[in-house]
Regions:
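Terminal domain-start leader segments
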Residues: 1-52, 79-90, 108-112, 131, ...
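Short, surface-exposed linear patches
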Residues: 43-46, 64-66, 72-76, 115-119, ...
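Glycine-rich nucleotide phosphate-binding loop and flanking beta-alpha elements
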Residues: 29-30, 59, 102
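Structural motif
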Residues: 24-26, 53-55, 76, 96-101
């Protein structure tokens, strides 16, 4: 599952003339890595991938994402760690989540980075649902339907919520 997502992401990058991407948006972080920790960033190149997090989450990251990513502790220096990965991977053009990466973080990453930057929107890659996602959505919908059906007898005019 994650392997196919990373492959689709890399194909997306090549279509957009980029050879790497920085991912910090929690939804994309989870989608492309399975990492559910509270803090982290992905730097994905065409043949390497790093998940940066802090010491609170390194074990969790290794358990959830260690198969696909090199897990690293950023030691409270996330921006410089991301920049280091971009330079180490020799990325020429890095995509970044324009609507999520803060200007402050962008400035800190780009200062000293040896690559160019390209804003990109990765939501289209999450739009096509996989079979397990459809199954989970159906299950959630059924739970919501049952909860609403259980609530209906109590909803009457004049009844306080």
């Amino acid at each position: 599952m994650i392997e196919q997502r990373i492959a689709r992401l890399r194909a997306f990058l090549q279509e957009h003339d980029a050879d790497g991407v920085i991912i910090v948006q929690p939804e994309n972080l989870r989608y492309f890595s399975a990492f559910t920790g509270g803090e982290g960033a992905l730097v994905i190149g065409l043949d390497q991938a790093v998940l940066w997090t802090d010491s609170r989450y390194t074990e969790q990251a290794a358990n959830q994402s260690g198969t696909w990513y090199d897990i690293k502790n950023h030691h409270n220096a996330l921006s410089s760690s991301i920049r280091s990965s971009l330079n180490d991977m020799e990325i020429g053009v890095a995509g970044y989540e324009e609507n999520f990466l803060t200007h402050f973080m962008y400035e800190n990453i780009s200062d000293g980075a040896l690559c160019g930057f390209l804003p990109c929107d990765l939501t289209s890659l999450r739009a096509v649902k996989e079979p397990y996602e459809l199954k989970a959505t159906r299950k959630a919908s059924n739970i919501a339907d049952r909860a609403f059906a259980d609530l209906l007898p109590y909803i009457k005019p004049g009844v306080t919520e």
